[in-house]
Amino acid sequence: MEYALNVLERLARRYRDEPTLHSIEVLNEPVSWSVFHGTSNTAKDVREASGSTHVPLRFLKRFYRDAYTRLRAILRPETIIVFHDGFRLLRWGDWFRRAGMRNVMLDTHQYLIAMEEPLFAGPARRLYLQSRHLPWLYRMLVGAREIAIRSAARHIPVLVGEWCVENRWAPRSRNRADAYRQVSRLQRAAWDASAGQVYWSYQLARSAKPGSGEGKPPRDPRNGGNLEAWDLTRVWRHGWIQADAPHDDVASAPSINGNRSKGH
């Protein structure tokens, strides 16, 4: 813990006077109990992973308080200090305000593919895999996250610091590109409830023709999962996110956004 705090202090001293420095995030994805126990069986080296566990909220709050105290003493007042929600967005309430923290932001990572994961592990898997059910399911899942973001944002500005359009519907859809566009519009409209949103921008695996965005969709070497929607360059090249199309224009995406009122 002390080592991590020292690294944060060194980073703050190095970059505090950079005019382009918007913020520093204290820690990336401190895992919750539910997330850890849902993925703990995927360790590549079981012996090395032995003893690992989730990050308790009490410990995380203590670390965040110490990190804030050290960083705020170094950074300029206008520089934002960002804290990840630890996959517990609604557990924070007004804690940051009560802790006396100024100019802070809460980062939450919202992946549709992760939201739907538990549903496909249960007995209703075949039902959910039928494409006609997935748009309804996505409206429900993303809508619930939008409500959670709005609730948390009453106490602290919320940043959707990671998201992407990966989902199980598009690869099974007759029109893959249109499915991705609908999922994009649905999420962008929901994440507008936050102070900002950042698409995952790193390429996880190259396609069959590196740099072209064409060829066979890249696959996760661990489980064969689809990675094509994680690469922002590929997504943008294929038009799966469209800058010239308002993401609240429901007329072009009736199957997912049909229940939204225009301009919401």
Residue ranges of each PLM-predicted region?
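Active-site region of glycoside hydrolase catalytic domains
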Residues: 1-169, 187-210
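Aromatic-rich peripheral "rim/lid" segments of glycoside hydrolase catalytic domains that contact
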Residues: 107, 170-264
